[in-house]
A protein has these predicted regions:
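Bacterial Sec-dependent N-terminal signal peptides
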Residues: 1-31
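N-terminal, post-signal peptide beta-strand-biased segments of exported outer-membrane/organellar beta-barrel
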Residues: 22-120
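Outer-membrane beta-barrel proteins
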Residues: 77-93, 142-146, 175-189, 251-255, ...
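Transmembrane beta-barrel strand/turn architecture of Gram-negative outer membrane proteins
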Residues: 90-107, 111, 189-212, 303-325, ...
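Outer-membrane beta-barrel translocator/channel fold
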Residues: 114-151, 210, 217-222, 245-247
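Outer membrane beta-barrel transmembrane domains
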Residues: 129-138, 235-488
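Surface-exposed extracellular loop regions of Gram-negative outer-membrane beta-barrel proteins
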Residues: 156-181, 189-192, 278-291, 384-390
């Protein structure tokens, strides 16, 4: 079945390529080899968040391209992992991305993909999309592996008329995972999103604004087939706490969320030089319901995400760039727990009050640099250097039980790329390394029973996040044109 899905994605890529020939009206004089080099360039996407505006994405590249990636990875994280995400994962997938110039005024762009994944040794989390719904997952003391599949489709259209540009994008992601061994979670998630943007030229810059919308839903059910019966499941509240009243056999849950957001930014008309800047804010409201208890709303999670970046880029000479980027972000996640009265008959009791739940704030500031020289017809060597430094301040507070975990972290990384070409063959060697340094770690967990599995998981996560460690990696790639329109 997985092979069939990959073949389908290959056919989609070939179809997109054929449509480019049919509908692309403008003259695209860039050679295939130059397109391959430029789409893989760090400079192309270095400005980052500004390209989320579908109107400004009109100017992402001045040429037509389609890229197909068949990829696979195995990652053994060992102790350097959150227990709720597992310590090993195996992935295989295929991704198609395309940008088509229909005419001098019109652009269409999109992506599609499929991914098969297996996570191992997942503890105290029987849901998917951990980063989105954490800490409000359903968990148990057994856990195990999780197998899953993801499908996604995104498409957009942008048009220019005089000084104005407008664009629209839409996307859908479907994800499911399961375990065919007790306990047997079966999760399905749907993620629908839209964005609308507009841009206006002011001299040598373009001013852009955008709004976006997201609708998310996850349905989960845990079953048991073993003769010895079921294991108790718990609805986690964070920092080792769970909703005691509904612990036991409430195995069906539903997460539903809506997000609204917007951004404003500026982009230079010549995207290869000058300053760009953007500020965005998103707010998402999500609730968790017990589907086997008359869809009783157990709790709510409200997330506010404020981001901004400023990028300066300069073209030193043809195909050589220098750039610096400053990123900052502030995320606040606030939980609200619903308290219900005594149950009676088929009722689980009336809502009598609410109580503030766990609050998480994540402050981040990052500085990145870039020097890159692309391959050209006149040279056989190229390369790039991308240094990056990030400061994080993560504060998790659960005031109702006087528990907290506060962490400060400094991350540094360096990516280096070397390019070489010999006639039609192009070789890429890339090395990256980083260091995660804990600056401070404070926590207080009164009343925590360290004999419990959930408490041991919490303490293991704190040990991981408050530790310091390094990482290294290498990548080798070869490119060779196999036909006039295709590069392998």
């Amino acid at each position: 079945m997985m092979l069939i899905r990959i073949i389908i994605m290959l056919l989609i890529a070939l179809f997109v390529e054929s449509r480019q020939e049919a509908f692309g009206q403008t003259t695209d004089t860039l050679s295939l080899s130059d397109k391959v080099i430029r789409t893989a360039s760090f400079a192309t996407g270095f400005r980052g968040e500004i390209w989320q505006n579908p109107a400004l994405y009109y100017y992402y590249t001045p040429y037509i391209w389609t890229r197909l990636d068949v990829n696979g990875a195995y990652h053994d994280k060992g102790k350097a992992s959150l227990k709720q995400e597992g310590d090993k994962d195996t992935r295989i997938g295929v991704d198609v991305n395309s940008f088509v110039i229909l005419s001098e005024r019109d652009r269409v762009f999109g992506s599609a993909g499929y991914r098969s994944e297996k996570q191992e040794n997942v503890l105290w989390n029987e849901n998917i999309d951990w980063k989105l719904i954490a800490p409000y997952v359903t968990g148990d003391s057994i856990g195990g592996f999780l197998k899953g599949e993801t499908y996604y489709f995104n498409g957009g259209y942008a048009s220019e008329s005089g000084s104005w540009t407008w664009g629209i994008t839409g996307g859908y992601r479907a994800f499911h995972n399961y375990r065919d061994k007790d306990p047997r979670p079966r999760n399905t998630a749907s993620d629908l999103s839209f964005a609308l943007g507009a841009g206006y030229r002011l001299g040598t810059y373009r001013l852009g604004v955008s709004v976006d919308f997201r609708l998310y839903q996850q349905k989960s059910e845990i079953s048991f087939l073993a003769d010895k019966g079921s294991t108790s499941v718990y609805h986690m509240l964070g920092l080792g706490m769970d909703y005691v009243r509904f612990a036991g056999n409430q195995t069906g849950t539903k997460h539903q969320g809506i997000r609204w957001g917007g951004s404003i930014g500026i982009l230079p008309v010549d995207t290869e030089k000058g300053i760009s800047a953007t500020v965005s804010i998103d707010r998402m409201s999500m609730d968790k319901k017990l589907s086997n208890a008359n869809n009783l709303t157990l709790l709510e999670l409200n997330t506010t995400d404020l981001k901004g970046n400023v990028t300066w880029m300069r073209e030193l000479q043809q195909a050589e760039h220098l750039a610096v980027k400053l990123d900052a972000g502030y995320i606040v996640r606030k939980g609200m727990e619903n308290i219900y009265g005594e149950a009676g008959g088929s009722s689980y009791g009336a809502l009598i009050s609410t109580s503030p739940g766990m609050k998480v704030t994540n402050s981040r500031i990052a500085v990145s640099g870039l020097w890159e020289k692309l391959l050209t017809d006149k040279g056989v060597w190229g390369g790039a250097i991308v240094p990056n430094i990030i400061y994080h301040r993560l504060e998790t507070d659960y005031n109702a039980v006087s528990r907290f975990v506060h962490l400060s972290v400094l991350e540094s990384s360096l990516r280096a790329r070397l390019l070489y070409q010999k006639r039609l063959l192009r070789l890429t060697a890339e090395a990256n390394g980083g260091y995660y340094a804990n600056l401070s770690a404070e926590y207080s967990l009164p009343g925590l029973n360290t004999a419990k599995s959930s408490a041991q998981t919490l303490l293991a996560n704190i040990d991981y996040l408050s530790d310091s460690y390094s990482m290294v990696g290498i990548r080798l790639q070869g490119d060779y044109p196999i036909m006039k329109q295709y590069n392998l």
